[in-house]
Amino acid sequence: MNKHQVLKQYFGYDEFRDGQETLIDSILSGRDTLGIMPTGAGKSLCFQIPALMMDGITLVISPLISLMKDQVEALNQAGVHAAYLNSSLTASQYYRALAYAREGRYPIIYVAPERLVTEEFLDFARNTKISMVAIDEAHCVSQWGQDFRPSYLKIVEFIERMEVRPVVSAFTATATKEVRDDISDILMLRKPTVLTTGFDRPNLYFGVQAPKDKYETMKNFLELHPGQSGVIYCLTRKNVEEVCEKLRADGFSVTRYHAGLSDAERQKNQEDFIYDRAAIIGKDRKSGSAGMPRPIS
C-alpha cells in the first residue's frame, strides 16, 4: 500500500493535514526528521504511517504509560498490531510481548525510555530489524523544556549501541528555538528535515477574569455549556478535591487526576474522561495535559 491507502484504510482519512505528508516522505526517504506541530495536528500519524510501510519494527519512545496505552489501543482498534513495553506490565507479560515482537507480530512497539538500555531489550534490538526510532514528546530531552526527563538521554546511548542505525524521527509541540536546537543536538540527528507547522488555533479562546466567586463563575459557565467536556486546572491537589466535590454535589459528571492518587485510580479516572464516562476532569497544574487524547468542547 502507498501512504494514501494506509491513511484511508487504517485511520479513515482521505487527505493529509498540514505538514504530515512532508514529514512522512522525509522518513520514508531515510532521512532523520524533526516535526514541530501543535497539539491536535496529527503528529502520531507522521510516524505511524511510515512504520506500516517500512520493513521492520518502529520503536516509539513515549514518556507516559497512559499515553502509550491509549495510542496502542487506538492502533489495535484500527487493525494495526501494536504493543507497549513499560513498568505497567508484569515480567511474564513483558517477555511474552518481546517474544511476539521477535516473531514479527508488531510493526509498532511503544517503549518507555528507561527500558531501552536494559540488557534484555538491547539483546532484542540487536537481533531484530529496527527500521525507525520515533521519539514522541521530544522536548523531554531538552533541559530548556519544562518537561525535561533525564531518562530521555538514554535514547542516544541506545541508538549508538545498535549495530545498524535506524532512521530517527522526533516530534514535539514545543517550538522554541532553544528546545528545537537541543533536540537535534542531543539526539544527534543527521542532517534532519525540520518542519514547523502553523500554531494558529482558531478553535481556542483565551480569556482572563478575576471573579469574586470563582466557583460560582465556573459553575455558571458549565451550565451554559451542557453536554460539553473540559479540563479544570487547579493550583493544588486540595483545590482539585474541593472543586470536584462541589461539582459532584451540584450534579456534574466529574472526575479527578493528580499525583496524590494511586496509579490505578489515575488511570481509571483518565479513561472515564477519555471515554465519555465523565464530562469534566479536575487536575492540578503539575499534571499537564499529555496523555489525554480527547477533543475538548
Where are these regions (language model features)?
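Short, Lys/Arg-enriched, disordered terminal segments
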Residues: 1-2
